[in-house]
């Protein structure tokens, strides 16, 4: 994926030391590694990112997928590694051998605001979330009158 998306910076963080295999990713100019990342560093990465790739083959740490959702990052995952299916739209989950489809989705949403908005809407629908105004509208229709 890194080679297929040379204009995308991949920020890869771990709260521990990184394996030699992961460290070898430093050879790519669009990869930045963050071994032994602190909570503060992780929070900064969430704030600065547009996407969260749920492709870690090990256990999820610190509710990473939920945190990505709360930071309004588009979440894309591999079916074999998806940790946060409650927050990931089914159409954003790909078989790992079908990574070119994920690459195509990344290119689509990063190059088109409307595509990103539609993808985020699908993600919000999966998580059954509402905006404040949507909640107010629903409460008003349930309660009748102007209670909100």
Model-found features: residue ranges?
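Conserved catalytic-core segment of nucleotide-activated headgroup transferases in glycan assembly
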Residues: 1-24
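Nucleotide-activated donor-binding/catalytic signature segment of Leloir-type glycosyltransferases, i.e.
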Residues: 20-40
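Short acidic alpha-helix that forms the nucleotide-activated donor recognition element
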Residues: 38-49, 70
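Acidic donor-binding loop of glycosyltransferase active sites
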Residues: 47-60, 73
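Short hydrophobic beta-strand element within catalytic cores of glycosyltransferases
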Residues: 73-79
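Short acidic/histidine- and often glycine-rich active-site loop of Leloir-type glycosyltransferases
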Residues: 79-93
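Conserved acidic donor-binding segment of nucleotide-sugar-dependent glycosyltransferases
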Residues: 91-100, 108-113
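A charged, aromatic-enriched C-terminal amphipathic alpha-helix characteristic of glycosyltransferases
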Residues: 111-147
